[in-house]
Amino acid sequence: MPPFAAPVPDDEPPEPPKGRRPYSSPTAEPEVEPRRPRRVVNRPDKLVAGGPLSEPEPAEEEPETYQGTRIPPYVRVYPVEEPPETEPVPEPPEEQSEDDDEPGVRRVGRPPAGRPTRPDLLVATGPPRPQGSSGRHHRGPAPAAMRRAGPVRRGSRATPIVLSVAAAVLVATGVLVWQWSGEEASGLRLEAGMGRSGDELFTVPAAGDGVNQKLNDMASADRAVVAVGSDTTSPTPRPLFLFSPDGGKTWQLGQVSGVSTPTVQRVVGGDGRWLASGGDGSSGERGLWTSTDGFSWSAVERPGPDAFRAGDHIHDIARTASGFVAVGHTTGEDGGSGAAAWRSDDGARWERVETRGLEVREIRAVVAKGDTVVAIGQPAVGEGSRVLRSADGGRHWQATGFQLPEALPRTGTLGLLPKQFVLVPTRQRTVTGDVRVYCSPTGAEWKQCGTIGGLSGESPGVESLISHKSGVAAITQAGLGKYSVLTSTNGSDWNKRADFADLSGATLRGFTISDAGTLFAGGDQAASDVDNQLVLMAAPARGEAARVKLGEVEGLARIARETTALTSFSGRYVAVGAASGDAGLWTIKNWQSWKSMSLGGPGRQSLGDVAHGERGWLAVGATETNVAVTDPLLVTSADGESWKRIEVSGDLARERDHPYLTTHVVTAGEQGYVLAGESKDQAGVSRAAVWFTPDLRKFTRSEKLPHGGSGVHIHDAVASSDGFVAVGGSGAADQENSVVWHSDDGVNWTARDPVSPPGATSAGLRRVTSYQGKMVAIGTALVDGARRAFAAASDDDGATWRTAWLPAEQAAAVYDLAAADEGLVAVGWHGAPGEGDSAAWTSQDGLSWNRMALTKDRLAGRGMQWLSAVAVSRADDSGAEVVALGRSTTYNADHLILWTSSLSASR
């Protein structure tokens, strides 16, 4: 759908596991040190357990010393009206008349006033319910008769909400809901429990860290040097800002506040005004950040009411004497593209400027000298490039008469000399091998002023231009892993400034020359099949190029790790996910010790779900065998300890013209196992994929799916009394339709009516479980432009549903759902965006819910904490054991959370 949050006080970043090197040696020719090779599995039918791990001692309580800012990296914030204060509702009397035919109904907007007599317990009131099943993927007994309350009265509140860009993220806003008030003092009781660090528990033996970091651009002013990019190390991506206050002698991770996209593409600035822009170019998300010093950055969350629209994309930015300009394109509802431009005085408040009449369909590059701005775009008719000009800081634009029919416009085509503008066609050489250079003193009239010659025969031409204090520099790629930089002070005479050679597997994208004359280059390098690490090079004015030592930058290195699902059976818990680029399996029996298992093999691997059935355990996921191909990953175990990989063949194999096929959902019932995933063709068109196996040996792919499964994403599935039910959604995020499929045999599926709360314009289901013989699901809906989490319950295996909103007084997200005999438990977070704490919701009927604030140990504090996976298991006659996995993360720290608690129902 998934945030920067504070680590637990006193938690120091753990030592990197021995044998791992997050970064290479800082030399001019990067040293390739021996790395522990990826483990080869000689016995493919056996997986090796890492052995018992000792439980870490709880950290002592000490005052927090972290001074950074805290934001979620991949969420957008939508402000909505704050709820009005309401009078507290008095508690009902403990005793009621036996003559009352119906129990009362009361509204709940916040936790009841006063303190509980047991402050270590979190108590939720509600009606007594019959005993039921104890897992999201397990079917419970037939339902008992349910006594209905009197007339239901519902009220709602609007509060700030959050929409995450992580997969399957549910967002809830505040809402008043009704709850039961029975004749007995009954209800669910959820203990506050204990949270502890999971950093040392959820690891796997691996040769790399699974990191995915890139540098995309650089800028410098005076002694400040800034490098920007992205850190999409799953599952907590963040925008990347590196800062040097002393001309590149030392580097540190910048400070970032606010909520934004995790990818920064461009940066400009100096003299107290800096601007960065970003976005991934495919999802439609944009990001803008401002800074006064290049170190502390703030995301622009409200750029202006009419400045940006859906379909806008920023290609380039420039600093002017009066502020900043941005250029790009916009895509209309009909799919047509048009030029777009914006200006701002301070980088925080933006206005859209008129671009009609410029006869270009997009603007790719822009530079400014004072308030004279020059841009280059693609003509509305034909190919090539057309130059545009503004004389007033980007408020008004005119098309010049200068065009280059043979050159495509690209970012980096334009540069600045002290007295004139410079244009160099990128990746374009003449028949003689030279590159033409054009100059203009005003940006209106252009003429050729020189050529760049002597390029390598392997070079396609100039990759980009950069401007610096004394002139311009042209970047050329001489071959794979080889770059040359040429400089000029007049546009006609060019001299080689530096070579960056022997950068095997590296790509350089960002360049800058500081006022002191040091040339910097930034990019990334494939360090292994699961690692993509930063590259930052520095070449002094008089000296050799050398690699900047980034391994010592505090908070920069991260190890990819994620726990995606958790389930239990007969006293054993099994968690699945990924760590260091490999699929991860972790298990514990009777709380002796957690054991970790690694699958080995090439490619980036992950597991998304796990279930237990009559034939044993089955975990499903995906393997990225290369950047273009993804295959299903299935592993099975009879005892939860020894796991073996299932051969992907037959119906499990990809079609030849479909490079992408994954499995991310599994459930088990009396008939067998149902798996769900996604298939994509070469054009990127996706379809749902479903399989059934009765014995974990023969897998049958369903050929009969409603509408062929086109555009459908199945998020969860569960066994029902007469087969299986799968839930999910189809369509875009703001126009999603919920999906409910039913199958008698796990192979042939039919669609049932969509589930949508009243007034919702968009709705999708994310989790489903079986409880007391009925289906209970959690979903997300769009109402009046705001997202809310809702629950749905069905007594007839998904044929019809009743819905209710989940209570939340602030922004909230619900990630997982589990069922016990005592009731239902859902987990996620609640609070201010970027400052939320872990939260749990409980219910005894699937429709009336109570939110529990979890404030102890690692579950709350500075920053963002959340629980993402939950499982329940029968502990004893007094109640059920609740185990949840989660995360606590900041911009420069990231920790896993293990929470244990218990759930009981008083009668």
What do these predicted ranges mean?
Residues 231-236, 280-284, 330-335, 379-383, ...:
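Short glycine/acidic-enriched loop and turn motifs that connect beta-strands
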Residues 211-217, 260-269, 308-319, 358-369, ...:
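Repeated scaffold domains used in trafficking and secretory/extracellular systems
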Residues 220-228, 272-276, 319-327, 371-376, ...:
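Entry beta-strands of beta-propeller and related beta-repeat scaffolds
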Residues 142-187, 422, 519, 618:
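Hydrophobic single-pass membrane-targeting/anchoring helices
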Residues 204-239, 264-265:
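Beta-strand-rich domains and repeat architectures in extracellular enzymes and scaffolds
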Residues 244-245, 290-291, 343-344, 390-391, ...:
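Conserved Ser/Thr-centered positions that define the repeating blades of beta-propeller domains
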Residues 200-210, 253-260, 300-307, 353-359, ...:
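Short loop/turn motifs that cap or connect beta-strands within the blades
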Residues 510-512, 520-522, 527-538, 542-545, ...:
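Blade-level signature of beta-propeller repeat domains, shared across WD40, Kelch, NHL, RCC1
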